[in-house]
Amino acid sequence: MLDILEIMKRIPHRYPFLLVDRILEMDKEAQIIKGKKNVTMNEEFFNGHFPGHPIMPGVLIIEGMAQCLGVMVMENFPGKVPYFAAIENAKFKNPVKPGDTLIYDVKVDKVKRNFVKATGKTYVDDAVVAEASFTFVIADM
């Protein structure tokens, strides 16, 4: 649905911290977005996490979910950016390794003024590898 160039028009993140390659689905009415990240051995974080046993840091999986959410939510807040206010109930169920394809599935649960509450899950091969609930504050860049 949206390629990397369209994603980069909507959120400020750039390499090496842009963690979404493609938006697969965006349902603004249901407030659901699905994104994709192809994890390669060339990712900067694999240099130190962990040498000889590369595993994607769990916090970066959560960041990828947040970036997907930003693509959808920020259309309603031009010129602003979402910042984490809280991360709750984060669970990491399986390691993510080079060669995996992450599928982010995020849903907005509530928007109140400049606060957004959401929940998300990330999958590799239909298995949940991470999940969390988030609160964002929408603020000036």
Curated annotation (Swiss-Prot):
Its main location: cytoplasm. The gene is fabZ. InterPro entries: FabA_FabZ (IPR013114), FabZ (IPR010084), HotDog_dom_sf (IPR029069). This is 3-hydroxyacyl-[acyl-carrier-protein] dehydratase FabZ. GO terms for molecular function: (3R)-hydroxyacyl-[acyl-carrier-protein] dehydratase activity. It comes from the Bacteria. Transmembrane segments: none annotated. NCBIfam families: fabZ, PRK00006.1. Belongs to the thioester dehydratase family. FabZ subfamily. Keywords: Cytoplasm, Lipid A biosynthesis, Lipid biosynthesis, Lipid metabolism, Lyase. Its EC number is 4.2.1.59.
